[in-house]
Amino acid sequence: MLTALLLLPACRAQAAQAVFAGGSFWVMEALFADRPGIERVEPGWMQGESRLQRRQVVRVHYHDDRLSYGELLRLYWQAVDVFDAGGQYCDRGTEFSPALYVDGPLQLKWARQSRSQLGLEWGRQPEVRIFAVGRFEPAAARHQQYYQRHSLLYAAYRSVCGYPDGRGFSLPPLLAGSRVN
Protein backbone atom coordinates (compact mmCIF):
# COMPACT_ATOMS: atom_id res chain seq x y z
CA MET A 1 0.00 0.00 0.00
CA LEU A 2 2.78 2.44 0.93
CA THR A 3 4.62 1.67 -2.32
CA ALA A 4 1.49 2.49 -4.33
CA LEU A 5 1.10 5.82 -2.53
CA LEU A 6 4.74 6.73 -3.14
CA LEU A 7 4.32 6.10 -6.87
CA LEU A 8 1.34 8.46 -7.26
CA PRO A 9 3.38 11.68 -7.49
CA ALA A 10 5.61 10.07 -10.13
CA CYS A 11 2.56 9.22 -12.24
CA ARG A 12 1.33 12.83 -12.05
CA ALA A 13 4.62 14.07 -13.51
CA GLN A 14 3.82 12.65 -16.95
CA ALA A 15 3.34 15.26 -19.64
CA ALA A 16 -0.05 15.92 -21.19
CA GLN A 17 -0.36 16.36 -24.95
CA ALA A 18 -2.09 18.86 -27.22
CA VAL A 19 -2.12 18.99 -31.03
CA PHE A 20 -2.38 22.23 -33.02
CA ALA A 21 -2.54 22.98 -36.75
CA GLY A 22 -1.77 26.57 -37.65
CA GLY A 23 -0.03 26.65 -41.01
CA SER A 24 3.62 25.71 -41.23
CA PHE A 25 4.74 23.29 -38.54
CA TRP A 26 8.07 25.12 -38.50
CA VAL A 27 6.26 28.25 -37.27
CA MET A 28 4.06 26.37 -34.81
CA GLU A 29 7.07 24.53 -33.37
CA ALA A 30 8.89 27.82 -32.82
CA LEU A 31 5.78 29.31 -31.19
CA PHE A 32 5.48 26.63 -28.50
CA ALA A 33 9.13 25.61 -28.02
CA ASP A 34 11.27 26.84 -25.14
CA ARG A 35 8.38 27.98 -22.96
CA PRO A 36 8.03 27.16 -19.27
CA GLY A 37 5.94 24.05 -18.73
CA ILE A 38 6.46 22.70 -22.25
CA GLU A 39 8.62 19.59 -22.36
CA ARG A 40 8.94 19.23 -26.14
CA VAL A 41 7.24 20.05 -29.41
CA GLU A 42 7.07 17.61 -32.33
CA PRO A 43 6.22 18.79 -35.84
CA GLY A 44 4.36 16.26 -37.93
CA TRP A 45 1.22 15.36 -39.81
CA MET A 46 -2.31 14.55 -38.72
CA GLN A 47 -4.27 12.33 -41.07
CA GLY A 48 -7.58 13.79 -42.30
CA GLU A 49 -10.85 12.21 -43.36
CA SER A 50 -9.28 10.76 -46.51
CA ARG A 51 -5.90 9.14 -47.06
CA LEU A 52 -4.78 12.10 -49.18
CA GLN A 53 -5.90 14.76 -46.74
CA ARG A 54 -3.54 15.69 -43.94
CA ARG A 55 -2.45 18.79 -42.04
CA GLN A 56 0.85 20.01 -40.74
CA VAL A 57 0.59 19.99 -36.95
CA VAL A 58 2.65 20.16 -33.81
CA ARG A 59 2.20 17.81 -30.89
CA VAL A 60 2.99 19.70 -27.70
CA HIS A 61 4.06 17.70 -24.64
CA TYR A 62 3.48 19.83 -21.56
CA HIS A 63 3.31 19.54 -17.78
CA ASP A 64 -0.32 20.11 -16.87
CA ASP A 65 0.61 20.99 -13.31
CA ARG A 66 2.56 24.01 -14.64
CA LEU A 67 0.60 24.95 -17.75
CA SER A 68 -3.02 24.39 -18.74
CA TYR A 69 -4.55 23.46 -22.07
CA GLY A 70 -6.47 26.73 -21.87
CA GLU A 71 -3.20 28.68 -21.67
CA LEU A 72 -1.88 26.82 -24.73
CA LEU A 73 -5.07 27.72 -26.59
CA ARG A 74 -4.62 31.40 -25.72
CA LEU A 75 -1.12 31.31 -27.19
CA TYR A 76 -2.39 29.51 -30.30
CA TRP A 77 -5.17 32.05 -30.90
CA GLN A 78 -2.60 34.87 -30.87
CA ALA A 79 -0.58 33.23 -33.65
CA VAL A 80 -3.13 32.09 -36.24
CA ASP A 81 -5.44 33.90 -38.63
CA VAL A 82 -8.65 32.39 -37.26
CA PHE A 83 -10.77 33.61 -40.19
CA ASP A 84 -8.71 31.95 -42.95
CA ALA A 85 -9.84 28.34 -43.46
CA GLY A 86 -7.87 28.10 -46.72
CA GLY A 87 -4.43 28.05 -45.10
CA GLN A 88 -2.28 30.45 -43.13
CA TYR A 89 -0.59 33.54 -44.50
CA CYS A 90 1.26 32.57 -47.74
CA ASP A 91 0.84 28.82 -47.15
CA ARG A 92 -2.37 27.73 -48.87
CA GLY A 93 -4.44 24.56 -48.88
CA THR A 94 -5.87 22.08 -46.38
CA GLU A 95 -2.34 21.04 -45.37
CA PHE A 96 -1.89 24.51 -43.83
CA SER A 97 -5.43 25.21 -42.61
CA PRO A 98 -5.95 25.88 -38.89
CA ALA A 99 -7.45 23.16 -36.71
CA LEU A 100 -7.45 21.89 -33.16
CA TYR A 101 -7.10 18.17 -32.50
CA VAL A 102 -8.59 17.41 -29.11
CA ASP A 103 -7.92 14.47 -26.85
CA GLY A 104 -10.96 13.89 -24.69
CA PRO A 105 -14.00 15.79 -23.44
CA LEU A 106 -12.11 18.41 -21.41
CA GLN A 107 -9.97 19.53 -24.34
CA LEU A 108 -13.08 19.53 -26.55
CA LYS A 109 -14.95 21.72 -24.05
CA TRP A 110 -12.05 24.20 -23.79
CA ALA A 111 -11.52 24.30 -27.56
CA ARG A 112 -15.20 24.99 -28.26
CA GLN A 113 -15.55 27.57 -25.48
CA SER A 114 -12.41 29.48 -26.41
CA ARG A 115 -13.35 29.48 -30.12
CA SER A 116 -16.85 30.76 -29.25
CA GLN A 117 -15.38 33.46 -27.00
CA LEU A 118 -13.15 34.60 -29.85
CA GLY A 119 -16.21 34.77 -32.10
CA LEU A 120 -18.02 36.98 -29.59
CA GLU A 121 -15.00 39.28 -29.26
CA TRP A 122 -14.54 39.65 -33.04
CA GLY A 123 -18.21 39.59 -34.05
CA ARG A 124 -17.83 36.59 -36.37
CA GLN A 125 -17.09 32.91 -35.94
CA PRO A 126 -13.52 31.65 -36.38
CA GLU A 127 -12.93 29.20 -39.24
CA VAL A 128 -10.79 26.90 -37.07
CA ARG A 129 -12.13 23.35 -37.14
CA ILE A 130 -12.04 20.97 -34.19
CA PHE A 131 -11.34 17.26 -34.65
CA ALA A 132 -10.60 14.30 -32.42
CA VAL A 133 -6.91 13.41 -32.31
CA GLY A 134 -6.07 10.91 -35.00
CA ARG A 135 -2.90 9.22 -36.15
CA PHE A 136 0.12 11.48 -35.70
CA GLU A 137 3.04 10.98 -38.07
CA PRO A 138 6.28 12.76 -37.06
CA ALA A 139 7.83 14.97 -39.73
CA ALA A 140 11.14 13.95 -41.27
CA ALA A 141 14.28 14.82 -39.31
CA ARG A 142 15.06 17.74 -41.64
CA HIS A 143 11.87 19.47 -40.40
CA GLN A 144 12.55 18.95 -36.68
CA GLN A 145 13.78 22.14 -34.95
CA TYR A 146 14.07 23.83 -38.33
CA TYR A 147 13.71 27.26 -36.71
CA GLN A 148 16.91 26.58 -34.69
CA ARG A 149 19.03 24.68 -37.20
CA HIS A 150 18.30 27.09 -40.07
CA SER A 151 17.54 30.25 -38.13
CA LEU A 152 18.30 32.73 -40.95
CA LEU A 153 16.31 30.80 -43.57
CA TYR A 154 13.47 30.32 -41.11
CA ALA A 155 13.36 34.02 -40.18
CA ALA A 156 13.31 35.01 -43.86
CA TYR A 157 10.55 32.49 -44.66
CA ARG A 158 8.41 33.57 -41.71
CA SER A 159 8.81 37.25 -42.54
CA VAL A 160 8.20 36.95 -46.30
CA CYS A 161 5.24 34.64 -45.75
CA GLY A 162 3.65 37.02 -43.23
CA TYR A 163 3.63 34.83 -40.13
CA PRO A 164 3.89 36.85 -36.90
CA ASP A 165 6.98 36.46 -34.76
CA GLY A 166 5.57 34.36 -31.92
CA ARG A 167 8.42 35.17 -29.53
CA GLY A 168 6.55 38.31 -28.51
CA PHE A 169 3.42 36.37 -27.59
CA SER A 170 2.90 35.66 -23.94
CA LEU A 171 0.99 33.09 -21.96
CA PRO A 172 -1.43 35.27 -19.98
CA PRO A 173 -2.47 33.60 -16.74
CA LEU A 174 -5.98 32.22 -16.59
CA LEU A 175 -8.40 33.08 -13.83
CA ALA A 176 -7.69 31.31 -10.57
CA GLY A 177 -9.46 27.99 -10.35
CA SER A 178 -9.97 27.62 -14.10
CA ARG A 179 -7.03 25.31 -14.76
CA VAL A 180 -7.94 22.33 -16.96
CA ASN A 181 -5.64 19.48 -17.98
Show the residue positions of the predicted features:
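Bacterial N-terminal signal peptides
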Residues: M1-P9
